[in-house]
Amino acid sequence: MSEPGKHSPLDPLFDTNPWYKDVLGGYRDLRADELISGHQAGWEVDSLCINTAVYLPWLLGQCLKAGVVIKRAVLSHIREAKGMSHTGKPADIVVNATGLGSLKLGGVEDKTMAPARGQIVLVRNECTPMLSSSGTEDGPAEVLYIMQRAGGGGTVLGGTYDIGNWESAPDPNIALRIMKRVVDARPDITGGRGVEGLSVVRHAVGLRPYREGGVRIEEERLDDGTWIVHNYGHSGWGYQGSYGCAEAVVELVERLRRRTGSKI
């Protein structure tokens, strides 16, 4: 945990008495000699890292195995989705999980949505355990984390959390700061050789679907009678919260079906 008065978008994850200490195993407070310089407190906890390059194809395969029909289309209005059912009949219920697209999608146009720009550096160097910090000296939009992916997926060095920034190209100055923060915190990642010892695979930028007020999971009825179940605005925790949010969506859909006799 960084010094007080320096706020980060990730602050809800960091507390001297974190809510998840009794949910995840292996929790312990770090000793003073284990802390990163400039930090007042820290802890260790069992966690996991998802290699998305492996996980997403597997998840798609599970959907296909379950009989899900995949279609690609460009929609200007959410109501257009009701005509895309593989049955050839209009759907009575549409689940909207369009992420950042919900900002401009007709029929939704949620102005509380904004991009939260994230820039990372993917390297071949290995570094365990994972590390995450509540803030840095480089401004409120810049954070520090190190995540080694399983299955030879490289190690992700981060990063940024810049709300309202649409820039999709990596910034070389930010990339240098990311790498410097990482080697300062974990010099062992390069065997003490500094930034020059990092074997960079690529630089990347993603736009997280940030929503002021948090994720939106609720039902809404359009003027034409179509029911929409919204599930968007997960910001940077879409993978972590996906199963819980999906269960909430299923509950809403089933409740609507019982109440209205609708078909999804």
Task: Tell what function each PLM region has.
Residues 77, 81-136, 168-176, 185-196:
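Central helical "cap/lid" subdomain
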Residues 33, 192-264:
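C-terminal catalytic lobe of FAD-dependent flavoproteins
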Residues 39-93, 97, 102:
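Helical element adjacent to the flavin cofactor pocket in flavoenzyme catalytic cores
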Residues 6, 100-102, 162-163, 235:
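Short, solvent-exposed loop/turn segments at secondary-structure junctions
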Residues 1-67:
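Flavin (FAD/FMN) cofactor-binding and adjacent substrate-gating region
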Residues 54-62, 177, 181-185, 248, ...:
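Amphipathic alpha-helical segments that form well-ordered structural scaffolds
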Residues 35-40, 124, 155-160:
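Short, basic/glycine-rich phosphate-binding loops at helix/coil junctions
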Residues 129-212, 221:
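Active-site lid/adjacent beta-loop-alpha segment flanking the redox-cofactor pocket in flavoenzymes
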